[in-house]
Amino acid sequence: MTKGTPSFGRMSRGKTHIRCPRCGRHSYNIVKGYCAACGYGRSRRIKRGLAKVLGRPVGNR
């Protein structure tokens, strides 16, 4: 029975994200193959317009 706290140390092995070729941010997921910031590696680019302009989250809470 070794679930829980002792197993959490196993999660920090290796890199999950590397630098994205398109936007340059450290958001490109190696396993999934796309960038979490700009969407590089997918068919469409991720657009985050209004929330970035206003500087706060937009939508239902």
From Swiss-Prot:
What keywords is this UniProt entry annotated with? Answer: Metal-binding, Ribonucleoprotein, Ribosomal protein, RNA-binding, rRNA-binding, Zinc, Zinc-finger
Gene3D superfamilies from the xrefs? Answer: 2.20.25.30
Output the Gene Ontology cellular-component terms. Answer: ribonucleoprotein complex; ribosome
Domain of life, per the record? Archaea
Q: Which Pfam families match?
A: Ribosomal_L37e
According to the UniProt entry, its GO molecular function terms are: rRNA binding; structural constituent of ribosome; zinc ion binding
Indicate yes or no for the key word Transport.
no
The residues that hold Zn(2+) are 20, 23, 35, 38
* Coiled-coil annotated spans: none
> SUPFAM superfamilies, from UniProt?
Zn-binding ribosomal proteins (SSF57829)
Per its Swiss-Prot or TrEMBL entry, what cofactor is needed? Zn(2+)
In the record's cofactor note, how is the cofactor described as bound?
Binds 1 zinc ion per subunit.
InterPro entries, per database record: Ribosomal_eL37, Ribosomal_eL37/eL43, Ribosomal_eL37_CS, Ribosomal_zn-bd
- The zinc fingers classed as C4-type run over 20-38
Can you supply a Gene Ontology BP term from the record?
A: translation
**Family named by the database record:** Belongs to the eukaryotic ribosomal protein eL37 family.
Entries under NCBIfam families matching the protein: PRK04179.1
Q: What does this protein do?
A: Binds to the 23S rRNA.
Q: What name goes with this protein?
A: Large ribosomal subunit protein eL37
Q: Write down the species.
A: Caldivirga maquilingensis (strain ATCC 700844 / DSM 13496 / JCM 10307 / IC-167)
